[in-house]
Design a protein with these regions (language model features):
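Beta-propeller and closely related beta-pinwheel folds
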Residues: 20-151
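N-terminal accessory interaction module
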Residues: 1-31
Length: 151
């Protein structure tokens, strides 16, 4: 899991190290599986962002968004498997991006702009709150770009 850089409450004092991440409290691997970025067979964590109160972790073509509930901050598992809550974790692949490995997500004009070496896209958020039912990524362009610096 990602490391945390946190203010300690004292002026100019910060801590850096492993954080406490909530585990799976409901379900099993069939109905509440582990996030894609923990899979050793994938490319690991390729980028981080935040959007609409969710921490976003990119892992190759996978986009994983934490829960946005107050109690579920940084929770990457569903809290119940009997119903799908709007605040639950969101995870999907952008199938129209043909193997893109996302590195950056930049909030812009109420949307989230996605960037990889050969694909650019957008997660629309202007007219809606993202939920597991409506989250999608749309391909906007396929230009080659240098990702040495954030767009």
């Amino acid at each position: 899991m990602p490391l945390l850089f946190q203010a300690s409450g004292t002026v100019n004092q910060h801590t850096f190290g492993p954080g406490t991440w909530p585990g799976r409290l409901a379900g099993d691997d069939n109905n509440n599986d582990v996030p894609a970025f923990t899979d050793a067979d994938l490319s690991g964590i390729t980028g981080l962002s935040s959007f609409q109160g969710r921490l976003i972790i990119f892992s190759g073509p996978y986009i994983t968004m934490s829960s946005n509930s107050r109690d579920g901050k940084n929770n990457f598992f569903r809290t119940t498997v009997t119903q799908m809550l709007d605040s639950d974790r969101i995870e999907f692949t952008a199938t129209s991006f043909s193997g893109a490995s996302f590195k950056y997500g930049i909030p812009f004009n109420s949307d989230l702009i996605l960037a990889s070496e050969e694909h650019q896209g957008v997660i629309p958020g202007r007219n809606q709150i993202l939920t597991p039912q409506n989250a999608t990524a749309l391909l906007t362009s396929t230009y080659q770009m240098d990702l040495a610096s954030e767009p």
